[in-house]
Swiss-Prot record:
Non-classical phosphatidylinositol (PtdIns) transfer protein (PITP), which exhibits PtdIns-binding/transfer activity in the absence of detectable PtdCho-binding/transfer activity. Regulates PtdIns(4,5)P2 homeostasis at the plasma membrane. Heme-binding protein that may play a role in organic oxidant-induced stress responses. Its cofactor is heme b. Signal peptide: none annotated. One of its GO terms (cellular component) is cortical endoplasmic reticulum. The lineage of its organism: Eukaryota, Fungi, Dikarya, Ascomycota, Saccharomycotina. It is a peripheral membrane protein. Heme binds at residues 158, 188, 213, 215, 249. This is Phosphatidylinositol transfer protein SFH5. One of its GO terms (molecular function) is phosphatidylinositol transfer activity. Its main location: cytoplasm. It comes from Meyerozyma guilliermondii (strain ATCC 6260 / CBS 566 / DSM 6381 / JCM 1539 / NBRC 10279 / NRRL Y-324).
Length: 336
C-alpha cells in the first residue's frame, strides 16, 4: 500500500552551502543562481544554459502560454510574476534529478509542462472538492522548530482506509469526461501541490517536504488491485514531475515481518545509500524524535492526549501562490 521505492538518483558533486567564502579568482564572475546548493563551475553553467533555454522549451511543449510549475511562473527573467530565485531553484531540481545532464533535464521539463497543462494539478489542489472518504486519508501539517526540511509534512493515514476495494471501485477509475485521472489520483496530487505551497524553494532548510505513511491496522499482504494500480501511477507521476522535493519518507507501524523487505531492496542494490538515507522504517509510530512531542498525538509518542485524527485539527492552512491563482482563473475561462 506504500508508494513503492522510487528509482534512486545519484547526485554527484552536490555539496551543502558553506559559510566559507570562495576566494578562487576564476569563480568571482560566476553568477550566483541558487542559494540552496553549492554548484561547481560546470554545474552552474549548465543550470544557466537550461534557464536561458526556457523560452524554447516552452515553445516545444505545444502551448508556450502554460509556463507554470508548482504554482510559480517558469519563464525568462523580466516577465511579470517571474521570481528569478524561485524559478532557478525549481529548474535546478530537474537538473539534479538528471545528474546535471542538460538534454535529459530539458526533456524532463518539457514533459512536466505538458503533463501539468493536461492534468491541471492546480485545479486538483485548490478548485476541486473530494469525497470525505478521500479527504480522511491524508492531511498536511507544518511545524516550527523541527530539523531541516521536516517542517512541512504530508500524512498518508492508511489505517483510515476501511474498505480499500470499495473505495477504489468508487474513486479509482478514470473519468476522462470530466478531469484527467481518477478522483483518488487527483486528490493525492492535490495534496502534494498544496504541501508545496508551504515550502520556500530558496530556503535550504525548508525547500523539501517530509512524508509519513502510517500502516497501523493495515494488512500489507492483501492489497486491492485497484490500489496497486493507483499506487503505481502515483509513483510514476511523482518520479517524473516532482523531483528532489522529498527530504524524508517515514514508513511507520510496519509489521516486523515486512521490515526485511526494505533491507532486502537495499542489499540487492535497488535502493542506493543516498536514497536509503531518506527512509525511516519503523515498527512503531514513535515520531517524537523528528517532529517533537508537543506537535504529536499520543499515538506517535507525542505529549498531546489525543488520537491520530487530531492531526486534522492542526492541519496547515494552504493558499495558492499568486501565479497559481492566475493560471487557475485562465484554465476556468478556457473551459467556458
Amino acid at each position: 500500500m506504500s508508494e513503492p521505492i522510487e528509482k534512486p538518483v545519484e547526485k554527484p558533486g552536490v555539496e551543502p552551502v558553506s559559510d566559507v567564502k570562495d576566494t578562487d579568482p576564476a569563480k568571482k564572475d560566476q553568477p550566483v543562481l541558487v542559494s540552496t546548493t553549492k554548484l561547481t563551475k560546470t554545474q552552474s553553467e549548465t543550470l544557466k544554459k537550461l534557464i536561458d533555454e526556457l523560452p524554447q522549451i516552452l515553445e516545444e511543449t505545444g502551448d508556450s502560454s502554460y509556463d507554470e510549475i508548482y504554482g510559480y511562473r517558469i519563464n525568462k527573467s523580466g516577465l511579470e510574476h517571474v521570481h528569478d530565485e524561485i524559478r532557478n531553484e525549481i529548474v535546478l531540481k530537474f537538473l539534479i534529478a538528471e545528474e546535471y545532464k542538460f538534454e535529459e533535464a530539458r526533456t524532463r521539463l518539457i514533459n512536466t509542462f505538458k503533463w501539468r497543462k493536461k492534468f491541471q494539478p492546480l485545479s486538483a489542489a485548490y478548485s476541486e472538492t473530494f469525497d470525505k472518504e478521500l479527504d480522511d486519508l491524508g492531511v498536511i501539517t507544518k511545524y516550527d522548530g523541527t530539523n531541516e526540511n521536516l517542517h512541512v509534512v504530508t500524512w498518508n493515514l492508511y489505517g483510515n482506509l476501511k474498505s480499500p476495494k470499495k473505495l477504489f471501485q468508487k474513486f479509482g477509475q478514470d473519468d476522462k469526461a470530466e478531469k484527467e485521472g481518477s478522483p483518488f489520483l487527483r486528490w493525492r496530487i492535490g495534496l502534494m501541490e498544496r504541501a508545496l505551497s508551504l515550502i520556500d524553494f530558496t530556503d535550504k532548510s525548508n525547500s523539501k517536504i517530509a512524508q509519513v505513511h502510517d500502516y497501523n491496522n493495515v494488512s500489507m499482504f492483501r492489497m486491492d488491485p485497484g490500489m496497486k494500480a493507483a499506487t503505481k501511477e502515483i509513483i510514476k507521476i511523482f518520479g517524473d514531475n516532482y523531483p528532489e522535493l522529498l527530504s524524508t519518507k517515514f514508513f511507520i507501524n510496519v509489521p516486523t515481518i515486512m521490515s526485511w523487505v526494505f533491507t532486502f531492496f537495499r542489499t540487492i542494490g535497488l535502493v542506493s545509500e543516498d536514497t536509503w538515507k531518506k527512509f525511516q522504517v519503523l515498527n512503531s509510530g514513535n515520531l517524537a524524535t523528528w517532529f517533537g512531542e508537543k506537535n504529536l498525538p499520543k499515538a506517535y509518542n507525542g505529549s498531546n492526549d489525543s488520537t491520530v485524527e487530531s492531526l486534522f485539527a492542526s492541519e496547515a492552512k494552504t493558499e495558492a501562490p499568486e501565479y497559481a491563482k492566475i493560471m487557475i482563473h485562465k484554465a476556468a475561462l478556457d473551459i467556458d
